[in-house]
Amino acid sequence: MKKLSHSIDVLSINENECTSLLKACNLESRLSLDLNDIENVKKAVKTLSSEFGLKIDLHTRIGAAWSDGKDVLFVNSFYTVPKKLTGSGDCWDAADLVAYFVGLDTTERLLFSNAYASLYIGRREFEPPTIAEAVDFIQAHYQ
């Protein structure tokens, strides 16, 4: 991964991928692999980002984090009763890319991606929400 870091703008991973990378790099002994704790999520993403020398976005059940190896930022997930078990990570990644392309700052980007995935997983149908629906959801649920 270090050899590719000059070619990668950002690495987007989920909690299972994060745990696998930490284990593959023998970094799990330095921190807890319990990614149901905000501080552990922040430490994990910062550790991997520092190790690989690239920015990392990490999305988990409890929220999303970003790090460049020095700084780290975390945004909580929205509470949603899941109506399906697959696809939320793909929706999160798609929203994250859109947010990068339109120039949202890190907090806005993670918030938008969390909202988009939450809307998707909270619906019975397998169609992703619209951008407008995600914006409306944030305005109604974010404090």
List each language-model region with its residue ranges:
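Conserved phosphate/ATP/ADP-binding segment of small-molecule kinases
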Residues: M1-V72
